[in-house]
């Protein structure tokens, strides 16, 4: 799930983003990214999607999660041109590619372009959200990995994870437009990363400076 997926589902079903996460997903810390990720959790003996109705139809078909809407097309973002690990990732560093996954459904009678396939669910080919999502999650991943490598206390890491989870996934009002809220959250989180790198640079210059603490970062 991305933040946009959760927001769209919550708005469609008349629920809060927190309720959608509780009912349809689980939160874990990414193995390599080291930031909170929200995964959909299958339910029942048949391990079916929690968004399916009893008749087998999707309850959020017109705003289904991006991964579902894109299938069998996949979307991959790569970070290029970042030579310094402390260099902030920006949208100019992100390159998006589309791939076609193996599939065995459909009649193959109709041909689609990437643009027309994405347009079915109002996903633009040049997707500003996806670029900004990639940027902020990449910057957060670098920051948290470095904090773990520097052996920050577990309580501090838990505080950071809670902040990331709340700002990135939860703190949205479905009565308001999504993008302005996401852009604000992304800027706050990118600012947190910049503050961490700034404090770390100061520590490198003066080894007598204590390890950055969360109150300093915030």
Which residues make up each language-model segment?
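Short loop/turn segments that flank or connect secondary-structure elements
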Residues: 1-218
